[in-house]
Regions:
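Conserved pre-motif I regulatory segment
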Residues: 2-54
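A substrate-engagement module of RecA-like helicase motors
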Residues: 2-18, 47, 58, 78-81, ...
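Walker A/P-loop
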Residues: 46-68
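Signature of the SF2 helicase/ATPase Hel1-core->accessory helical subdomain module
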Residues: 66, 72, 89-92, 97-100, ...
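A contiguous, basic/glycine-rich beta-loop/short-helix subdomain that forms a polymer-engagement track
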Residues: 182-214, 224-234, 361-499, 564-575, ...
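Conserved interdomain hinge at the start of the Helicase C-terminal
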Residues: 440, 499-533
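Conserved RecA-like P-loop NTPase helicase motor core
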Residues: 487, 499-509, 561-670
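Conserved helicase motor "Helicase C" RecA-like lobe of SF1/SF2 P-loop NTPases
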Residues: 533-560
Length: 691
């Protein structure tokens, strides 16, 4: 229930915000968003389904809105808040700017912490060994270590021991080489809380800190990893949590990637052979009587897996592959492969269970003081590596062996020729739809959830997004939907131009035509951004126009030629000195690129960003929709393009006083039946359509 206490707390923080910020402009949309989040989370619309899906345009102040509403509700009810983002940039903004600001303006005391995956932390015991503190140093290196590597490890060890560093890779003053990090990274098997020597490890300390905090900032991948473990393992349990998913439009893809699995055949056989040779070494560290059964089971499983995987590589004919890929239509496997998958599932599962049991028995002896930690550590780290690989292998064959579903979307299953190993194949499996899983793991269990993004709707509807993430969009379900327009005055600040064009992007002459007409739509002494749908076309146009741009005194920078940071730094310098700056970019430049004011006044989009279903998952999804009598182009491709186009045009106005022009060089917006729907889903720019 939305108590007067919570309402008062929210009102106070809003009033204090006005006092804190000199240039604060009260926004009705922000007020409304705060109120709707609070009402939804307090069960005012629906007692059990407390979910709000909100599209909030640029400039509304999304992050402060959900902090102002969700934190008072959670603290009042003694619950946790997990804020999940898709990018590091937004996490940094929340931790360094928004949360400290909210802490200053609220009357509620709360604590917050950034949660990271285990792989961001070092293991104190591994670091001690690698730096030579407890002997066994050289055994950790495959080749003789360089002097500077040893010196770095020693410095890191001292900093950790003296409390000057917390073991977080991102907190070390300089980047740490992957080669060094792999030696000391925490893994869930050797860096285990049940082992006395690891209770003070950086990861264990960070995890225990999570429990003490009210607000936890995570990323979508970490939330999915916790959900896969049953929830409440890495993060607080869903039943005690209010989730806020910012940049929520990324959630469907992150969730799908998380539920996918792949493994190479020869590659797996090779590391299984190494495991086979080490079984006796590992077993000798455990209690002989208790380990015997698991050692025998492991030997039996591994000795069945190696020939089966090797034999499988001879069953596939690369001549039947298209561009190195063979996809099983409708996810259906031939009977012989179905049977083989069931066997491989059995053996890999048995091997995984046996290795995990041997690791447990070794850890038990360390705990009981029967085995020195320094002898067990290297073995447990190595076993951790094998357990991780076996878990993945077991997951691949579990999904491959799963019977074809009578209802719902099938699994996408495919093979790829290995890019680096001749005669090897990668076996991959992915679900097509992940919504039901998100519902089971999160929506049906959590206290409440808020999903926000600047681009949530496709073609002015939330339907596509709801289907992707498994949220019931029917009015009677109780789910709340909100689409808040940006506070910008689009009509007076920006123009959308769709010029008359000789060719559409599908015409073979389009690239040549683009080279001919593009300079006409660029502005002298201004900041220009041109967005392409393909790297190939971008590079062709850049190459053809570079000499003309030099003649005109225009500075051209192309995505990929330098780091994004370097490109933007140079761009800023050019704009500050009143030079013409032209940026060429593709997909990743159409999202998350923040160029306010004079840093971007002219945006050109060369074509509607239609995705081509090239990946096996996209192809399988299209096939499934066709089988159901649907139209994949209208059901997947157009809604996806709509979201991407909204993101692209969103680069132009970043702050309330910004202005400029967007030109879209794709006549299909006018000539095709879906064109009007795409235009109508864009912000309400002043439109100029040439005929």
């Amino acid at each position: 229930m939305l108590t007067s206490n919570i309402q008062k707390s929210i009102r106070n923080s809003y009033q204090n915000l006005q006092a804190q910020l000199d240039n604060f402009v009260p926004r009705r949309a922000q007020n409304y968003l705060v109120a709707e989040i609070a009402k939804t989370l307090c069960g005012q619309y629906h007692k059990s389904n407390r979910i709000l899906v909100a599209e909030a345009g640029t400039g509304i102040g999304k992050s402060l809105s959900y902090l102002m509403a969700a934190i008072p509700v959670a603290v009042h009810n003694n619950r946790k808040v997990v804020i999940s983002t898709a990018t590091v940039a937004l996490q940094e903004q929340l931790v360094n700017k928004d949360l400290p600001l909210f802490r200053r303006i609220t009357d509620r005391e709360f604590s917050f912490i950034l949660a990271k995956g285990r792989q961001r932390y070092c293991c104190a015991e591994k670091l001690a060994t690698a730096s030579g503190v407890d002997g066994g140093q050289l055994a950790m290196f495959e080749t003789k270590p360089k002097k500077k590597d040893i010196e770095l490890l020693e410095t890191m060890y001292r900093s950790l021991a003296q409390g000057k560093w917390d073991g977080d890779r991102d907190a070390w003053p300089k980047p740490i080489d992957d080669r060094i990090w792999q030696l000391i990274v925490s893994d869930k098997h050797s860096c285990n809380n049940s082992l006395p020597g690891h209770r003070g490890c950086p990861f264990q300390k960070a995890r225990s800190e999570l429990d003490k905090n009210d607000v936890i900032i995570a990323n979508h991948s970490l939330v999915m990893a916790d959900a896969d473990l049953g929830g409440g393992v890495i993060l607080p349990e869903p039943e005690n949590t209010i989730y806020v998913f910012d940049e929520a439009h990324h959630l469907p893809h992150v969730a799908r990637d998380h539920a996918s699995a792949s493994a190479s055949l020869k590659g797996a056989a090779a590391w299984l052979e190494k495991l086979n040779q080490s079984i006796s070494k590992f077993s000798s560290l455990a209690d002989e009587k208790r380990v015997a059964r698991f050692r025998n089971d492991l030997q039996d499983s591994v000795q069945n897996l190696i020939p089966a995987l090797t034999q499988l590589t001879k069953q596939f004919d690369p001549a039947q592959f298209e561009e190195g890929i063979y996809r099983f239509e409708h996810g259906e496997l031939p009977t012989w492969l179905e049977n083989q998958s069931k066997e491989l599932k059995q053996f890999s599962k048995k091997a995984n269970q046996s290795v995990a049991k041997i690791a447990d028995l070794i850890a038990e002896r360390v705990k009981d003081g029967e085995l020195a930690a320094r002898l067990a550590e290297p073995a447990l780290a190595e076993l951790g590596f094998y357990i991780q690989r076996l878990e993945n292998l077991a997951q691949v064959w579990h999904l491959m062996a799963e019977p074809t579903r009578e209802k719902g979307a099938p699994l996408a299953r495919w093979l790829e020729t290995h890019p680096d190993r001749e005669g090897d194949f990668i076996v991959s499996v992915s679900p097509l739809e992940i919504g039901w899983q998100l519902d089971q793991q999160i929506w049906s269990r959590c206290i409440g959830a808020v999903l926000v993004s600047a681009t949530m709707r496709a073609l002015n509807s939330f339907h596509y997004f709801c289907h992707q993430v498994g949220i019931d969009g029917k009015p009677e379900s109780g789910t709340q939907f909100l689409a808040l327009a940006s506070p910008f005055d689009y009509q007076n600040q920006a123009e959308l131009l769709i010029p008359a064009m000789k060719y559409e992007p599908s015409a073979p002459q389009f690239t040549e035509y683009l080279i001919e007409i593009l300079p006409k739509y660029l502005e002298d002494k201004k900041a220009n951004l041109v967005l392409f749908s393909s790297y190939w076309q971008m590079n062709q146009v850049a190459e053809a126009l570079s000499s003309e741009f030099i003649k005109r005194g225009w500075a051209l920078q192309v995505q990929g030629e330098s780091s994004r940071q370097e490109i933007l730094k140079k761009h800023k310098k050019l704009v500050e000195t009143y030079k013409t700056s032209v940026l060429f970019g593709t997909g990743s430049f159409s999202e998350g690129l923040d160029l306010p004011g004079e840093l971007l006044e002219n945006l050109v989009i060369t074509k509607i960003p239609f995705g081509v279903p090239t990946s096996p998952v996209e192809q399988a999804h299209s096939e499934y929709i066709e089988k159901k009598g649907g139209n994949p182009f209208m059901q997947i491709t157009v809604p996806d393009a709509s979201k991407k186009l909204i993101q692209s045009v969103g680069r132009l106005l970043r702050k309330e006083r910004d202005s400029g022009r967007v030109t879209i060089l794709d006549r299909r917006l006018v000539t095709k039946r879906y064109g009007q729907a795409l235009i109508d889903s864009l912000p309400p720019f002043k439109r100029k359509i040439e005929y």
